[in-house]
Amino acid sequence: MNWQEHIISDPKILIGKPTIKGTRISVELILDLFSSGWSEKQILDSYPSITSDSVRAVFAYLKDCIQQEFYFPISA
């Protein structure tokens, strides 16, 4: 999955937070919805401007961030 086709960061949109291309829906919002127990179907039904590929791109983006060691350390 090439997340760059779906995720952008534009300083004019949500102060540059990563968003789904063509929307003001942030990567952070999608992750928050999933962590709150929402299913992909619920997200797609609630936000019809995004696609399943866009949702998968959020996770591909997150994976690349983690691989680049772009994360917060967690103490044991």
Model-derived regions, located:
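Short, Lys/Arg-enriched N-terminal segment that forms or immediately precedes the first helix
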Residues: 4-19
